[in-house]
Amino acid sequence: MGASKIINYSEEELLIAKFAKALSHPARVAIIKLLLEKQSCICGDIVEDLPIAQSTVSQHLKELKESGLIKGNIDGASICYCVDTHVLQKANDILNKVLGASIQTQTTCC
C-alpha cells in the first residue's frame, strides 16, 4: 500500500475548492441565480420557482449554506435565505485573480 502524501494547500486553493464544490451542481447554481435575481431574502418560495422536490432543495440549500455562499435566518416557522454578497464577491475575486492570471500567462496549448 502506498504512503499517504501530506499536501499543504494554500488558503486560496482551499477556498476555490470549497466554492467549486458548492457550485458543482446545476441546481445549486440555479438557486444562487434565483436568490440574486430576487435581490432579497426568500422564505419558502424556492420550491415554487424551481422544478425540484422540497427535500432536494433543502439538501442543496444546506450545501450552499455550509460553503458560506448563502445565509439562512429563521423567520417564524420558516427559514429565509439570501446570498452572502461579501462571500460571493470574495469567491469572484479569488477566481478572477487565479484564473485571470493563468489565462494571461498562457501562450500556447498542445
Regions found by a protein language model. Name each.
Residues 61-62:
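Short, hydrophobic-biased segments on the C-terminal half of alpha helices
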Residues 48, 65-66:
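Alpha-helical residues within the helix-turn-helix
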Residues 43-44, 73, 91, 107:
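Short, hydrophobic secondary-structure boundary micro-motifs
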Residues 1-15, 37, 85-110:
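Amphipathic alpha-helical dimerization/coiled-coil segments
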Residues 14-53, 75-87:
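N-terminal helix-turn-helix DNA-binding core of bacterial DNA-binding proteins
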